Amino acid sequence: MTDQNFSNLVPVNIEDEMKVSYLDYAMSVIVSRAIPDVRDGLKPVHRRIIYSMYEAGNHASKPYRKSARIVGDVMGKYHPHGDSAIYDSLVRMAQDFSLRLPLVDGQGNFGSMDGDAAAAMRYTESRMAKVSHKLVEDIDKETVSFNPNYDGSEEEPSVLPAMFPNLLVNGSGGIAVGMATNIPPHNLGEVIDACCLYIDNNDIEILDLLEVVKGPDFPTGSMILGISGIRSAYLTGRGSIIMRGRAEIENIGNSRQAIIITEIPYMVNKARLVEKIAEMVKEKRIEGISDLRDESNKNGVRIFIELKKDVVVEVVLNQIYACTQLQTSFGVIMLALKDGLPKVMNLKEVIAAFVSFREVVITNRTIYLLNKARDRAHILLGLTIAVSNIDEIIRIIKASNNPNAAKQELMARSWDALNILPLVKLVDDKAMLNEQGKCSFTEVQAKAILEMRLQRLTAMEKNKLEEDLKNLATEITEYLNILGSRTRLLEILKEELIKVKEEFATPRLTSIEFGEFDQDIEDLIQREEMVVTVTLGGYIKRVPLSSYRAQKRGGKGRSGLSMRDEDITTQVFVGSTHTPMLFFSNIGQVYSLKLYKLPLSNPQGKGRPMVNILPLKENEHITNIMPLPENQDEWDNLNIMFATAKGNIRRSDLLDFKKIQSNGKIAIRLDEDDKLIDVKPCKEDEHILLATKAGKALRFPVESLRVIKSRTSDGVRGMKLAKEDSVISMTVLKGISSTKEDRDAYLTVPWEKRLEIAKGEEFNLEELGVTLTADSILEMANSEEFILTVTENGFGKRSSAYGYRITDRGGSGIINMDINDKTGLVVGVMPVKMDDELMLITNSGKLIRCKLESVRITGRNTSGVILFKLDDGEKVVSVSLIAETSESEEDSELEEDLEQAEEVYT
């Protein structure tokens, strides 16, 4: 290398050169490759493909052309990069599962949702989609600026004059240097409606825009869970949207069910999804699937998942959601180029940028059309003058030596324009008038006169010239109005948007499931009805309800659990695996637990000690378990009513027990010789019925008690008790507004007739023999409740709640049941419905279920009928109700056993 060569070198600091070069590279990637423009929603490669197809005449109305030719044109004229990058972009624009409105109409294999690659470009054919013409419409009217291509041989548009907000409609995704964009597709109709709202009110709130833009609308359909991610994305430009595939449940015979997946989340590979499900089944992370196959075809997605018998389908589906991409998230980053710079924008800013751009496009188009109209009017004015002075025009032309001389002579003369002055003023063409008010031809007009055909000399053509001038004058006036009035310009903008909506809008594909869907372990727990059994020794278990047989009244029952004589069942209730429960202990402490966390057992199993489940202190044991509504919104209007064996009661807010730490909290203060009998949720308009083991009962309104905020209070006296008597149950009843006289009169109607009236059957008021009105009887029949009373010797009865008069708390009560040595003491009192089932458990562990419709309805002061045949020394220790459940397979198999069950009436 010579010294002269070294003299041309410029020394630079490598650190500075790295900074400058890397920044140049980064900006090139951001501006020229990876980030879309907010105005037309396109990256340079997509814009070049569409413009190249438009320029080549590869329109939607024309035949398809080989994709290879299109790629070659784009690469040779505008995009000097690899052909594969161009073809991949073209393929994506043709995929109806990638774009909400495909911009390319492809013919051939353009890939699939399984991740299959498109056929080679030499095999596929393409043309512009019909909607793509709305992106390039008016591009020939100087609406957008053009820049030289990479070698200066061609010009390409810097942006397309898009007539709809393509950035939102089709979305975009890309990774640049130090930044990325990920914009989901939306519904065209919703986005255009939002644009119209913004045009009407530029100060509109983003939340108001959310009223019409419900959320992304993915081409693959599926569902969006919750709206918090949508709100965050639209308010800040960033957010995470949870997508979930759509699944249906089908019965396929033999008591089997199948999950049919018909829609999958956006950009999820269907083949990989099926493989992932199979992997999870093999690893036993998803259980209950017996067969899996992909039955998708040209009509849509169909993934068939056959389930094993007796599997809870919801649990399997939740496992699939948790372990696979059937539920996934879409991270929204609404980053786009605005004024040439990358910016994260919210929904309103994106819409505002598009509307502002369309204003510029319409303004530029109007200026272009105005200039064209004025140029045309200028020529027509010259032709009109020439026709009016045709003899002189012909003479000048004949006398001229050549066309140029004729043109100069025409331009040099002044022509009388009195007869066309109105037309000159109409088109606002002042260039023709000289100081004397006469007209002189311009060079353009003179040339047009020389090129005029002889047919223009007819009277019809003269009238047509004047008509054309008037039409042009109308157009010019309209263009000037548009340019002079932003209101008019916005009207046109809205009209054009609405036309696009009417032509291309389609119904929403993606549904929005409102509410929050933070999936936790509970979503993977089978929702199943369980019988919870608690023993005196502190053991607890849950057993599937289907494990017990339904028997008729008087049946001998079956063994429910095997226990020692000193360990008897104290509480039984039925609930879902997702039922929240409050555990109240003998020392007034309360704990919280979900039912599915209890040990699963069988009817003969003993369960587990509660001390191993709850953090109980020494000498502490659970005395009462209170199941609650699964929906905590239902807790707002509920109170908790405490009742103790000594007759004390206390009313508290249920919300005071909403948040309970794992180590529990104080619920109520108890005297040493007292114990907690029951705790129930109640409302202010309801009544409380306290019942004692000696057959007494007291009814009073909940509202007669004030809410006690102190959790350390022992409450107030609820019922005055006789010596050796104690409260054994507390029942919550509906409040009633009828008088005692009306209730007594109503109770004279036979109970069979009252039940018929409650079922809607017609009745004859005179035949009933009461003084009540028909409306009163109907109202009381529909509101009537029945109280079930059960004794330790297996006797029971149902009585109308209307027979229990309302008194003040603190009294001794009234007779609830006539008890004697035969019946034994009362062990349970509760409200029941006609379709309920009764569950009884004895101190020997024997259990029976019977339909309450077979239990006689009598007055309060009766002894009832035998419900349960007891062995010597056997006593009923627990009573519980089971709501009517759907008939299971096991119930069907026991139909014969139920019919043969013994019935005993006394």
Swiss-Prot record:
Residues 886-906 are annotated as: Disordered. It holds the Pfam family DNA_gyraseA_C. One of its GO terms (cellular component) is DNA topoisomerase type II (double strand cut, ATP-hydrolyzing) complex. The active site is at Y123 (o-(5'-phospho-dna)-tyrosine intermediate). The keyword DNA-binding applies. Heterotetramer, composed of two GyrA and two GyrB chains. In the heterotetramer, GyrA contains the active site tyrosine that forms a transient covalent intermediate with DNA, while GyrB binds cofactors and catalyzes ATP hydrolysis. A type II topoisomerase that negatively supercoils closed circular double-stranded (ds) DNA in an ATP-dependent manner to modulate DNA topology and maintain chromosomes in an underwound state. Negative supercoiling favors strand separation, and DNA replication, transcription, recombination and repair, all of which involve strand separation. Also able to catalyze the interconversion of other topological isomers of dsDNA rings, including catenanes and knotted rings. Type II topoisomerases break and join 2 DNA strands simultaneously in an ATP-dependent manner. This is DNA gyrase subunit A.
